[in-house]
Amino acid sequence: MDFLQINGGAKLNGKVKISGAKNAALPLIAMSILAGNDIKISNVPNVADIKTLAQLLRNLGASAEFLNENSLKINTNDINSTKATYDIVRKMRASILVLGPLLARFGHCEVSLPGGCAIGARPIDLHLSALEKMGAEIDIKDGYVVCKGKLKGATISFDKITVTGTENIVMAAALAEGKTKIINAAKEPEVVQLCEMINKSGVKIEGIGTDDLTIYGSGGKLLKFSDFSVIPDRIEAGTYLCAGAITKSKITITNANPNHLVSVLAKFNDMGFNFEINDDEITIIPPKTIKPTEIITSEYPGFPTDMQAQFMALACVADGVSVIDERLFENRFMHVSELSRMGADIKLNGHIATINGTHLNAADVMATDLRASSALVLAALVAKGTSRVHRIYHLDRGYENLELKLRNLGADIQRASE
């Protein structure tokens, strides 16, 4: 199994190009099930989760061909199965995104209950109750969600904001008969891009970018999509800014969208960092002393839960006491025990972490999920000595060429096998 070996203490400098957003690409790939034409998607990140979803489509009978490392051509005209099997779904929670489009197009589907990162319960009940309101009959049988029914427009009010739930229902509503209204919809940039692409395909969507969406379904008519490019990954962008921050290095990220990073940049400002922003480039300028901060995770446009672990690593070396309140997911502090192995001073009380800034020392640590693994890499960049980060298959699910990009910035980092 691969691990990363990192010698801490190197200063970083230079530029790093941000990849396309994994969390935007996944629903856009699932959206191809709604299409009656070939779709070409560019700026697709070359990460494991994307390859998994492309393979899932192939298993259904679609063609999904990588034209190069970051471009994907999909045709779903020859889908001959509507069963997404456990062997592929178990690798990735986002596989549930095929549920809405498969049901809307074919009137039946079976999707294995999802896998992926082990972060709390993350139930899919919200997806299922919404589809039932649209006319679906749903059973959970032998570990599969079994759905059938012709979907009709309905008013869906989510009790809790759900990103994948919003995406699933938007896609289902696109082919449903009549008007669907989604109240308390997610507003993330990844949801916005999905809505924009469907809107351009001829299905009218009102309220894009708000928490109140109205979708006028095509009544089963397949959609025609233009070629498009995936938006930049705001979480990857934030992670590389954290790499510059934790090593007190001036670095520049390119191909980023500063408008998607407002809450993250504000927290960096609180901690004493400044920025130069020029179109799609952001340069982070470190202070002499990193100030502590207080963070509460929330839905977009609030501070993203997917940046919580990285900022915890940064808080570990701040001058003072920081507090992080994780409001969105349970069990999302699994990196704490590993950071503690490196000398971090962190106390947990339920969903609140209190971090007393200190110096970090190298250690062997183990990744438990995607964002936790990036936090351990960040900590290792500044820890004294040589660290090894194990179970980095979590990293490969969501970060494209992480060690190569960090090495190009000057980090002393190598991938090796044990």
UniProtKB/Swiss-Prot annotation:
GO MF, one annotated term: UDP-N-acetylglucosamine 1-carboxyvinyltransferase activity
CDD domains assigned to the protein according to its UniProt record, in alphabetical order: UdpNAET
E.C. number(s) listed in UniProt: 2.5.1.7
GO cellular component: cytoplasm
Main location, first listed in the record: cytoplasm
Tagged with keyword Cell wall biogenesis/degradation: yes
Keyword terms of this UniProt record: Cell cycle, Cell division, Cell shape, Cell wall biogenesis/degradation, Cytoplasm, Peptidoglycan synthesis, Pyruvate, Transferase
Residues recorded with modification 2-(S-cysteinyl)pyruvic acid O-phosphothioketal: C117
EC supergroup of this enzyme: transferase
Pathway(s): Cell wall biogenesis; peptidoglycan biosynthesis
Active site: C117 (proton donor)
GO biological process, one term: cell division
Binding site for UDP-N-acetyl-alpha-D-glucosamine: R93, R122, P123, I124, D125, L126, D306, L328
Reaction it catalyzes: phosphoenolpyruvate + UDP-N-acetyl-alpha-D-glucosamine = UDP-N-acetyl-3-O-(1-carboxyvinyl)-alpha-D-glucosamine + phosphate
Chain positions recorded as phosphoenolpyruvate binding sites: K22, N23
Location of this chain's protein in the cell: Cytoplasm
PANTHER family (alphabetical): UDP-N-ACETYLGLUCOSAMINE 1-CARBOXYVINYLTRANSFERASE (PTHR43783:SF1)
Function per UniProt: Cell wall formation. Adds enolpyruvyl to UDP-N-acetylglucosamine.
UniProt record similarity statement: Belongs to the EPSP synthase family. MurA subfamily.
Protein name: UDP-N-acetylglucosamine 1-carboxyvinyltransferase
Protein's gene: murA
